[in-house]
Amino acid sequence: MAGKARVHELAKELGVTSKEVLARLNEQGEFVKSASSTVEAPVARRLRESFGGIKPAADKGAEQVATKAQAKRLGESLDQTLDRALDKAVAGNGATTAAPVQVDHSAAVVPIVAGEGPSTAHREELAPPAGQPSEQPGVPLPGQQGTPAAPHPGHPGMPTGPHPGPAPKPGGRPPRVGNNPFSSAQSVARPIPRPPAPRPSASPSSMSPRPGGAVGGGGPRPPRTGVPRPGGGRPGAPVGGRSDAGGGNYRGGGVGALPGGGSGGFRGRPGGGGHGGGGRPGQRGGAAGAFGRPGGAPRRGRKSKRQKRQEYDSMQAPVVGGVRLPHGNGETIRLARGASLSDFAEKIDANPAALVQALFNLGEMVTATQSVGDETLELLGSEMNYNVQVVSPEDEDRELLEPFDLTYGEDQGDEDELQVRPPVVTVMGHVDHGKTRLLDTIRKANVREAEAGGITQHIGAYQVGVDLDGSERLITFIDTPGHEAFTAMRARGAKATDIAILVVAADDGVMPQTVEAINHAQAADVPIVVAVNKIDKEGADPAKIRGQLTEYGLVAEDFGGDTMFIDISAKVGTNIEALLEAVLLTADAALDLRANSGMEAQGVAIEAHLDRGRGPVATVLVQRGTLRIGDSVVAGDAYGRVRRMVDEHGVDIEAALPSSPVQVIGFTSVPGAGDNFLVVDEDRIARQIADRRSARKRNALAARSRKRISLEDLDSALKETSQLNLILKGDNAGTVEALEEALMGIQVDDEVALRVIDRGVGGITETNVNLASASDAIIIGFNVRAEGKATELASREGVEIRYYLVIYQAIDDIEKALRGMLKPIYEENQLGRAEIRALFRSSKVGIIAGCIISSGVVRRNAKVRLLRDNIVVTDNLTVTSLRREKDDVTEVREGFECGMTLGYSDIKEGDVIESYELVEKQRA
């Protein structure tokens, strides 16, 4: 192969895969990128030598290789095999009779080839003069003796060509007539029939019979020695003598062609040849074939298994929204919450544009990089036969920590390293049932008075000592809000607890938040101890409470159940010690409360807020390990180093053991309430984990807050809609979260929308005011105030700031504001009817209708509609003028005649004018 060659061409030539060729080139120090790259001629030569000295098809004697395979497969001699193949080809073309063909005698006699021959110009250049001897002595084939050959009939004493024809069959077979591929008078594609009789020997200017096919010739095949010369064969030679078998990259009729094959083409052009030159017997050869294969091949190559598989998969692919998408085998695809179509396409090896088009046709308009909701991903996956699993936050966080070799939620070490820890108890129940009063009594502190409106709006964590059987035991209490707006905070408290105390007022009974607290505790598989409070009040009925709670699976021990009921009075202090003993007994009997205090600390952030002097402050509950000063800690998307720890009494501590609630100072930002925290080796790891969690949270928020618009609703979505933008600021993260969820749960109407554009912990700053001014938002401050400059800026910009101390007041005000933004609803109120009796035309005012009021009243400037035969002719007309007896009047009542103009000309006698007014209706 002259010049450069591509890797995949060399692979086909050598009969190996492209990967093997690339690997061999890399071993030789030739770094090639891909199978389509080219290599220089010396590199290609070394590559062929490295594969056992394999050479191109023309150089290694393609005829010899093909003849070996055919002789071995059929068990016949070479001559019989070639004769049978040629006979079959001639018979298949219907050549039953043979006749001599007149051709141009100025050129050599060469049989035709089924494929296309070289151009006439190149043929004339490559055709050597007649009578020039060939410089390529023959090479003996296997199984044949190298006896000297007889002189050529037309050239005595001249050695034979490089490709002699087969010996005639016994009895003397007449020679076949070849055809000149350089002759324009002979069609290249038409086969030549066999002549019935041998032709006499030809002169250099005449046609010559096939070598070995002379009259009476029956001698052995001449031997072949040496290598063929690179030039073309002499005229009259049975084959072309190009050593590269038809050029650089094509397979022609050079060495390896059947007798009668034409010479090879010029620099890559296919040479002429006989039928199926070098291929299987009876197969029609083509002009060009695959590399490394001798002779011609069928024009249309066979498809590889990979191509067939791709075509089959394409036909079997499902059609979703008019787009053909990949078809899965039911495999599970795991996607993070808030994933995009690009993420999904990468998992299934699909084109993201196809997924976008499919969703668009289904009425869902998303981009390839936009976060998509869980339901959309699952629906799209089911249509494509994929089981899409949206990873839960816990599993997602576990996968996030795996690259850092970190785990959360498991105690490390052996059993002997586990130590008994205090139980964590959550006080739950309906609002105003006495939860905080009970905790006050236990702590001997007045916490309730500090809460606005007497309603707990934070999660408080405290640890108290209890004297049980002469030994002091510690119990950690978590106080959760009971208001309906704090559902998430109650659920968070249930997940972080060991035992739940359900406080139910004896005079009030089971309420909605009581049932919700039961559901949270049962969902978290937490044992429940029921405290029936306010037994000192009139109308208290503890037995009624026991009966009501039986419906929810809480059966008292008195009724044969396993739930402990304690009748208490938090105000007086009745049976408080019995309640604490019940908690400890339940913990000892039903739970194995042990933890490893020697490992790095892990736990949960109960509450967090932004302090003016201390910065972000987080109340954390250590669940396992020991938290120490100087530890690098990460909680949610916040990270930092522990600079200070304070217990519930405000005392600085150096270390916090399991089940200890402490305030941690040192975070770079405010953690979210309920975020898991853990200690890592260095600040760099903490920052990387926090950044990844922050990105994950943004994607999930974008997927949840994105408003879906279908094609059917596109027109209405483009219309102007009312939207109330809010900025929420609070004193701690839990309160802000609860306020946002409560506000987003307000159901008013589809015409108005509520959008929280920003939220944060701490006072209202100038940045908040600037954002509110740019987005026409209202700032809601919960237990926080605005700074002096922020107040002045808000006054100048006209930004409204609303302050609240009780959460339900904020909810009520926002709901009223949303209802005020609704478009008014108008109700039609019928005023009267007038019948047109006569028409008068005026050049000044147009047509005047002379009417009589048949019912009700007709007022000037009132809305009217024109009826003809009880069919509305036109609507939304206005009484522009109203007169009675030449006097302008404001209204005319029933039974009186009047004249009026409507600004409408299509009026006839007998028409009816119906007067009405639109009255705004109060929304429900």
Curated annotation (Swiss-Prot):
Residues 429-436 are annotated as: G1. Its main location: cytoplasm. Residues 454-458 are annotated as: G2. Residues 569-571 are annotated as: G5. Residues 479-482 are annotated as: G3. Residues 533-536 are annotated as: G4. Pfam families: EF-G_D2 (PF22042), GTP_EFTU (PF00009), GTP_EFTU_D2 (PF03144), IF-2 (PF11987), IF2_N (PF04760). Belongs to the TRAFAC class translation factor GTPase superfamily. Classic translation factor GTPase family. IF-2 subfamily. This is Translation initiation factor IF-2.
